From Swiss-Prot:
Its cofactor is Mg(2+); K(+). It comes from Staphylococcus aureus (strain MRSA252). It is an enzyme of class 2 (transferase). Pfam families: S-AdoMet_synt_C, S-AdoMet_synt_M, S-AdoMet_synt_N. Catalyzes the formation of S-adenosylmethionine (AdoMet) from methionine and ATP. The overall synthetic reaction is composed of two sequential steps, AdoMet formation and the subsequent tripolyphosphate hydrolysis which occurs prior to release of AdoMet from the enzyme. The gene is metK. Pathway: Amino-acid biosynthesis; S-adenosyl-L-methionine biosynthesis; S-adenosyl-L-methionine from L-methionine: step 1/1. This is S-adenosylmethionine synthase. One of its GO terms (cellular component) is cytoplasm. The lineage of its organism: Bacteria, Bacillati, Bacillota, Bacilli, Bacillales. L-methionine binds at residues 58, 101, 252, 283. ATP binds at residues 17, 176-178, 243-244, 252, 258-259, 279.
Length: 397
């Protein structure tokens, strides 16, 4: 007899993971700039390694930001507050190498190709995409957050790992950590159980592996994962190397944009390749990916598909997307062509249209930079709202 069950795995990391430190620093700098200059152009990259951080990129703004101060405050909030943790916000070196946005790029963003020879004063018409590229958004009805279960639980576990460290429940934990969840699906593609959970957490030198394993199960896994998803066959791998004392930037260098699958759908949907953190919303790598999630989530919430993936693509300096594609993986209640037409009618997917539709000039980005940009339960981002459901239903009648 054929076994039609399948396994799917996703991972998340804590805010103290080196790559996530870099993402948070880049977005903290972006927020500090947008707070005073909502029209700033920011492309901020961060590298962290033992004892130092390097901030590089292109920033055009009318405001002043004390970048070293922002970096230190961010590292402090994450929890690297003592030299014995291998990284210390007070004593670390901070190097900056910031230039202005290229005028060649700026001219295409300031005035879109379609309107370059016209007298359009409307910002939505005038703004071109900041780069070429393709972006994906996805939603599924398998969880209440419209996210795949594996990435949803991975984020919840990673956040819980941080919470029990910060509130003192497990005061021997250190900021770096990773989580991985394997979900078993039945023959109808419904999640039925957790097959495997992997947790690797940085810890103090004087705690035993047995205590860590016992505490992580009691204080992280069991309070987070629904009881009905764990059974006697579920496997737990907690610090499987046996020791994780050296961590954070001392253990591995970190870079902005190296956790793009963690940031999105845990590998369950396609990815266009561009990262989010450190980029202002004229960069379609970020804003169009948020818009694509917004579209996909509203389509699924409207009951027009059980799962939906939206692809958007842009040309640098051009306002209108060069393509819109929708895939419902055979779960659509109407044709994908009808959905594309409904999306064109009810969503303005030009860069400035997205910025206006989702109010993206706010300093909201630092909080996106750990535990996922989508399907969050602790904060409602504008691209998660479900205000297009009725319009979409009416459009496909």
């Amino acid at each position: 007899m054929l076994n039609n069950k399948r396994l799917f795995t996703s991972e998340s990391v804590t805010e103290g993971h080196p790559d996530k430190i870099a993402d948070q620093v880049s977005d903290a700098i972006l927020d500090a700039i947008l707070k005073d200059d909502p029209n700033a152009r920011v492309a901020c990259e961060t590298t962290v390694t033992t004892g130092m951080a390097l901030i590089a990129g292109e920033i055009s703004t009318t405001t002043y930001v004390d970048i070293p101060k922002v970096v230190r405050e961010t590292i402090k909030e994450i929890g690297y507050t003592r030299a014995k943790y291998g990284y210390d916000y007070e004593t670390m070196a901070i190097l900056t190498a910031i230039d202005e946005q290229s005028p060649d790029i700026a001219q295409g963003v300031d005035k879109a190709l379609e309107y370059r020879d016209k007298d359009s004063e409307e910002e939505i018409e005038a703004t071109g995409a900041g780069d070429q590229g393709l972006m994906f958004g996805y939603a599924t009805n398998e969880t209440e957050t419209y996210m795949p279960l594996a990435i949803y639980l991975s984020h919840q576990l990673a956040k819980r790992l941080s919470d029990v460290r910060k509130d003192g429940t497990l005061n021997y934990l250190r900021p770096d950590g990773k989580v991985q969840v394997t979900v078993e699906y039945d023959e109808n593609d419904n999640p039925v159980r957790i097959d495997t959970i992997v947790v690797s957490t940085q810890h103090a030198d004087d705690v035993t592996l047995e205590q860590i394993q016992e505490d992580i199960k009691a204080h992280v896994i069991y309070p987070t994962v629904p009881e009905n998803l764990i059974n006697e066959q579920t496997k737990f791998y907690i610090n499987p190397t046996g020791r994780f004392v050296i961590g954070g930037p001392q253990g591995d260098a970190g870079l902005t944009g190296r956790k793009i699958i963690v940031d999105t759908y845990g590998g369950y949907a396609r990815h266009g390749g561009g990262c989010f953190s450190g980029k202002d919303p004229t960069k379609v790598d970020r804003s169009a990916a948020y818009a694509a999630r917004y579209v996909a989530k509203n389509i699924v919430a409207a009951g027009l598909a059980d799962q939906c993936e939206v692809q958007l693509a842009y040309a640098i300096g051009v306002a209108e997307p060069v393509s819109i594609a929708i895939d419902t993986f055979g779960t659509g209640k109407v044709s994908e062509g009808q959905l594309v037409e409904a999306v064109r009618k009810h969503f303005d997917l030009r860069p400035a249209g997205i910025i206006k539709m989702l109010d993206l000039k706010q300093p909201i980005y630092k909080q996106t930079a750990a535990y996922g940009h989508f399907g969050r339960t602790d904060v409602l981002f504008p691209w998660e709202k479900l205000d297009k459901v009725e319009e979409l239903k009416d459009a496909v009648k």
